[in-house]
Structure formats: structure tokens, C-alpha cells
């Protein structure tokens, strides 16, 4: 019996030991319950894209990561995340947050990454980020911030990355980043900044990359970036910068990349780059530069990449320092530099224009002439051969004036004729070839797609040619034919003579032949017959025949042989010498 009692006591002790363990496991499981419409992965909670208007409840206090992206949260209240003291990162981007309480981040001191981008935040209190001194990454980009408070980032000594991109900031307060000693990356691009105070970036001793692109700066002085000994890259592209000055009393040896593209820079002061001896990459494209001085290119001793396209290069002798520097430059360079002037070489590549028009060779010739201006034998003038057409008058004038004016033009073939570049010939040939190919293609497609129309067109053109040939042949047949007619124009007195006396002048006219006049000695009214009328002229004179008593000869009379013509019998015979048949006129006796 005692043995059974001991066994029961041992069983009870085991149950008492296991019961607290089970309760602890159950409590832990309840504590780690995942909120509705969320996804939990260990200590990471994802409540994304479910239109949450507030922070979900029942989030485990031991969660280390919380993502509330793409929801409809509009406001962050005081102590909103107080129960989540183990949070390391918090994503609140792509919401509609417009108001943030200054105590919204109380209780999450361990937070290292806070993303508030793509919201509608217009204002942040001075102490908003004081409860999170361990922040490494703070993203406030793509909001509507208009100002930064003077102590906005106070105490953020561990901050490494700060995004303020695409807001509406107009100024940067003095020493606003004073406590951000470890800041490595600062993005202030796409704002409305017009100027920078001298101490705006004071305290950023470890800053390596600074973005100021797409703002409204009109001038830049390197003195506005004091003692940024570790800054390697600065981006100032697409502002309104017209001038650059250095104003530094120290050497900025850490800067490697400088982007000034897309501005309105018209000129660079000669000593601007002297304080940047280690500059490796320089972007000056899409500005309004016309030339670069010799002193400036001499300061580019460490460059390995440069872009200069999209400027208004003046292809005169002022471009020569840059041309020779680029010719000897072995790094990565932009080769599409186009001349904006003078007018006769606009659109040419700078390198082609300089070599074609000998723009810089003249400068070398002038220097050579200067070195020989003091000859030992003045009786023998020094003659320097030129690669272009030699003109003694020009050479002589060069010796008389050893310092030519800047507007001096090179005498040579370029003044007599305009040079045609080889690439223009190639481009024209290609354009002509493409035009012919396009025409042939259109004809081929039309022939394949509409064969009946093409056949009709060919038949129409063939018929047109046939008609034209028929007209020409008809014109050739009609041209030798002559018009024959009898012109009888009696006056009143002659009519009376003919009717009374039976005689009078009669005029017969053959067009293109001859005109004859013959008197008639007839008795009573004579009768005439026309043999083989040609064009119906006898029919045309039928009324005259009826009036005067003329009648057509009978066939029996027409066949009478031995027709004799003579003045005694008053017969007239006219034979046409053309393609028309002969006409015989015969007097018939009553």
C-alpha cells in the first residue's frame, strides 16, 4: 500500500511540473497571434495593401519588423507604437499620412529604420524624431514638407542615410545637421532650394554623397561646403546655375565626381578647379559654354571621364585649348561636340571643323613666326610654308604685324569655296538611296495589291500613245493636200457684159498653185462640165450653175475621145500637181 502511495505522489509531482510549462507555451502562442488580414513571418508582420485606416490590433510586442505599406492611414497618433518596444524597422510609406504627432514614436527606442516616403506630410514638429536616437535610415522623400525645424534631426548621431527628395523645401536651416556626425548619404534633390547658407552642412564630417539636383540654384560657391573632407560626389545637375566660383582657402582633395549638367553656365572662372586636384568625373553637358580657358584645362589633371556635349561652342581660336586637351585626353569623353558659331560652320563637329578649316593650326604658325621674328640676316626674309594656298602678300603682312588680331581669318581655299564634309556626302547618298528604294517599294506593293488597276493604267497609257501617233499620221497626210476652189467675183458691169455680149473676165484660183484669167468668146450662154470633182466644189457652186444655165455633162459626152484643148475653142484644162486627181473643164456646144 505504501508502494502505491509513493507512485501516486510521484505522478502528481510530474503533473505539477508540466502544468506551468504548458501554460507558458499557451500564453506565448496567444501573444504571437497574427492580426487579421496580415501575414506573419516569425517576428516580422506584414500588413500591406489592405486599406488599413489605423494600426492593426493584436500585433505581437516582440515583433521586430512591421510593414504597413500601401494602406489608408491618415494620421499617426501619440504613443501609436508604444507596445512594440522591440521594433527595429517600420515601413509606413505609400499611405495618406498628413499629420504626425510629436510623440508618435515614443516607446520604440530601438528603431533603426523608419520609412515615411510617399505620404502627404507638410509639417514635422521639432521633437518628432527625438524618441528614436538609434535611427540609421530615415526616408521622408516624396512628401510636401515646406520647412525643416532647426532641431529637426537633433540627437540622431547614428543616422547614416537621410532622404528628403521631392518635397517643397525652399531653405536649409543653419546647422540643421549638426548632430548627424555619421551621415554618409544626403538627398535634397527635386526641391525648391534657391540658395545655401555657408554653414548649412556644418557637422557632416563623414558625408560622402550629396544630391542637390533639380533645384533652383542660380550660382554655386564651393565655399558653401565647408570642411566636407570626405565628400566624394556632389550632384548639381538641372538647376539654373550661371556661374561657379570656388572661394576656398583649402584644397578639396576628396571630391571625385562633380555633375553640373543641364544648367546655364556660360563661362568658368580660370581658377575654379584649382582646389579640386583629385576630380575624376566631370559632367558639363547641356550648358551654354562657348569655350574653356587654358588655365581651366590645366587644372584637370586627374580626370578620367568628361562630358561636354550640348553646349554652344564657338569654333574660333578660343576653342583651341580645349581641342588640344581633348586630343591628348585618354579617358572617357563625349565626342558629339557641335559648333554653334561662326555661322558658316554651324552644325559641324568641333573636331572636324578645327581640322577642316585649320582653326588651330594658324595659332601654331603665329607662335612659330613670333619665335623667329628676330632673324640674324634681315636681308633674307623668313618664309614659312603653309599647308593651304600660299600667298606672298599675306606672308609679308604677317611679318609686318607679328600679333594678329583675334578676328584674323586664315587665307586659303576655305575662303574661295565652301568645304563639303565627307559625312555629308555619305548622308546625302544614303538619303537618295532610301528615297529610290521607297518609291520602288510603293510601286511593287501597288502592283501586287492592285494588279487590275495597274493593267488599266498601262492600257490607258498605251491607248494614249496610239491616239497621239494616229493624230501625227493624220496631220502628215493632210499637210500636202492643197485646197482647190473656183473664185468667181464678177462686178455688176461684168455681169451685164456676160449676159449681153457673152464675154467677160473669169478668174480661177487654185490655192497653192496659180491664178489665171481668160476671156470668153461665146455665143449664147456657155455650159461647163467638171470632170471628177474632188472635194465637192462643183456641188458647192450648184446655185451658180442653175442661175447661169450651167449643167453637168452627160456620161456619153464625158466619154468622147480626142479631147483637144485650145484657145480657139475656148477650153480650159487645169491639172493639179498634188495628191488630188486632175480637173478638166470643158465647153459644151449647144
Curated annotation (Swiss-Prot):
Tissue specificity of this protein: Expressed in neuronal tissues.
SUPFAM superfamilies reported for this sequence: L domain-like (SSF52058)
GO CC terms of this entry: extracellular matrix; extracellular space; postsynaptic membrane
Ranges annotated as spanning the membrane: 425-445
Membrane disposition: Single-pass type I membrane protein
Topological domain ranges for the Extracellular compartment: 31-424
Compartments where located: Cell membrane; Postsynaptic cell membrane
InterPro entries: Leu-rich_rpt, Leu-rich_rpt_typical-subtyp, LRR_dom_sf, SLRP
LRR repeat boundaries on the chain: 62-83, 86-107, 110-131, 134-155, 158-179, 182-203, 206-226, 230-251, 254-275, 278-299
Positions of the LRRNT domain: 31-61
Disulfide bond residue pairs: none
Classification via SMART domains: LRR_TYP
Signal peptide (from-to): 1-30
Glycosylation-annotated residues: 58, 126, 291
Domain LRRCT: 311-362
Cytoplasmic membrane side: 446-590
Keywords assigned: Cell membrane, Glycoprotein, Leucine-rich repeat, Membrane, Postsynaptic cell membrane, Repeat, Signal, Synapse, Transmembrane, Transmembrane helix
Predominant place of localization: membrane
Entry keyword NAD: no
PANTHER family: AGAP008170-PA, INSULIN-LIKE GROWTH FACTOR-BINDING PROTEIN COMPLEX ACID LABILE SUBUNIT
Function comment: May play a role in the development and maintenance of the vertebrate nervous system. Exhibits strong synaptogenic activity, restricted to excitatory presynaptic differentiation.
Subunit structure: Peripherally associated with AMPAR complex. AMPAR complex consists of an inner core made of 4 pore-forming GluA/GRIA proteins (GRIA1, GRIA2, GRIA3 and GRIA4) and 4 major auxiliary subunits arranged in a twofold symmetry. One of the two pairs of distinct binding sites is occupied either by CNIH2, CNIH3 or CACNG2, CACNG3. The other harbors CACNG2, CACNG3, CACNG4, CACNG8 or GSG1L. This inner core of AMPAR complex is complemented by outer core constituents binding directly to the GluA/GRIA proteins at sites distinct from the interaction sites of the inner core constituents.
Family note: Belongs to the LRRTM family.
Descriptive protein name: Leucine-rich repeat transmembrane neuronal protein 4
Amino acid at each position: 500500500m505504501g508502494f502505491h502511495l509513493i507512485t501516486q505522489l510521484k505522478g502528481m509531482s510530474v503533473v505539477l511540473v508540466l502544468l506551468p510549462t504548458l501554460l507558458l507555451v499557451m500564453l506565448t502562442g496567444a501573444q504571437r497571434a497574427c492580426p487579421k488580414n496580415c501575414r506573419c513571418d516569425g517576428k516580422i508582420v506584414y500588413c500591406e495593401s489592405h486599406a488599413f485606416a489605423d494600426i492593426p490590433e493584436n500585433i505581437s510586442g516582440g515583433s521586430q519588423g512591421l510593414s504597413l505599406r500601401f494602406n489608408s492611414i491618415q494620421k499617426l497618433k501619440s504613443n501609436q507604437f508604444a507596445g512594440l518596444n522591440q521594433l527595429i524597422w517600420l515601413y509606413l510609406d505609400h499611405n495618406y499620412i498628413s499629420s504626425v504627432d510629436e510623440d508618435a514614436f515614443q516607446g520604440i527606442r530601438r528603431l533603426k529604420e523608419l520609412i515615411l516616403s510617399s505620404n502627404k506630410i507638410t509639417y514635422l514638429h521639432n521633437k518628432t524624431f527625438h524618441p528614436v536616437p538609434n535611427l540609421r535610415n530615415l526616408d521622408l522623400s516624396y512628401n510636401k514638407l515646406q520647412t525643416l525645424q532647426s532641431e529637426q534631426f537633433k540627437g540622431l548621431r547614428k543616422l547614416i542615410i537621410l532622404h528628403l527628395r521631392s518635397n517643397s523645401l525652399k531653405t536649409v536651416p543653419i546647422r540643421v545637421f549638426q548632430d548627424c556626425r555619421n551621415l554618409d548619404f544626403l538627398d535634397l534633390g527635386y526641391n525648391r532650394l534657391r540658395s545655401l547658407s555657408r554653414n548649412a552642412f556644418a557637422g557632416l564630417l563623414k558625408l560622402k554623397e550629396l544630391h542637390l539636383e533639380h533645384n533652383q540654384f542660380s550660382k554655386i560657391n564651393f565655399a558653401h561646403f565647408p570642411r566636407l573632407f570626405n565628400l566624394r560626389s556632389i550632384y548639381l545637375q538641372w538647376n539654373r546655375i550661371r556661374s561657379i566660383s570656388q572661394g576656398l582657402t583649402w584644397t578639396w582633395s576628396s571630391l571625385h565626381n562633380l555633375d553640373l549638367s543641364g544648367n546655364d553656365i556660360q563661362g568658368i572662372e580660370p581658377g575654379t578647379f584649382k582646389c579640386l586636384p583629385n576630380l575624376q568625373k566631370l559632367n558639363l553637358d547641356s550648358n551654354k559654354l562657348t569655350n574653356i580657358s587654358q588655365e581651366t584645362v590645366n587644372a584637370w589633371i586627374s580626370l578620367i571621364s568628361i562630358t561636354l556635349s550640348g553646349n554652344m561652342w564657338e569654333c574660333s581660336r578660343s576653342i583651341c585649348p580645349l581641342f588640344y586637351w581633348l586630343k591628348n585626353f585618354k579617358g572617357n569623353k563625349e565626342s558629339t561636340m557641335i559648333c554653334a558659331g561662326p555661322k558658316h560652320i554651324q552644325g559641324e563637329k568641333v573636331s572636324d571643323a578645327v581640322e577642316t578649316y585649320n582653326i588651330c593650326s594658324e595659332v601654331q604658325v603665329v607662335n612659330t613666326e613670333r619665335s623667329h621674328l628676330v632673324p640674324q640676316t634681315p636681308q633674307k626674309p623668313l618664309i614659312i610654308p603653309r599647308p593651304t594656298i600660299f600667298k606672298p602678300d599675306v606672308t609679308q603682312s604677317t611679318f609686318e604685324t607679328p600679333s594678329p588680331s583675334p578676328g584674323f581669318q586664315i587665307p586659303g581655299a576655305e575662303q574661295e569655296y565652301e568645304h563639303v564634309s565627307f559625312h555629308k556626302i555619305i548622308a546625302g547618298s544614303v538619303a537618295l538611296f532610301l528615297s529610290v528604294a521607297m518609291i520602288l517599294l510603293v510601286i511593287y506593293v501597288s502592283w501586287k495589291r492592285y494588279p487590275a488597276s495597274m493593267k488599266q493604267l498601262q492600257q490607258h497609257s498605251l491607248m494614249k500613245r496610239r491616239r497621239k501617233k494616229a493624230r501625227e499620221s493624220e496631220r502628215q497626210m493632210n499637210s500636202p493636200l492643197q485646197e482647190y476652189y473656183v473664185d468667181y467675183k464678177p462686178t455688176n458691169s461684168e455681169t451685164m457684159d456676160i449676159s449681153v455680149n457673152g464675154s467677160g473676165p473669169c478668174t480661177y484660183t487654185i490655192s497653192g498653185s496659180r491664178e489665171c484669167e481668160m476671156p470668153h468668146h461665146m455665143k449664147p450662154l456657155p455650159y461647163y462640165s467638171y470632170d471628177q470633182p474632188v472635194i465637192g466644189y462643183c456641188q458647192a457652186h450648184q446655185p451658180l450653175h442653175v442661175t447661169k444655165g450651167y449643167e453637168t455633162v452627160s456620161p456619153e459626152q464625158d466619154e468622147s475621145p480626142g479631147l483637144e484643148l485650145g484657145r480657139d475653142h475656148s477650153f480650159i484644162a487645169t491639172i493639179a500637181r498634188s495628191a488630188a486627181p486632175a480637173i478638166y473643164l470643158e465647153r459644151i456646144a449647144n
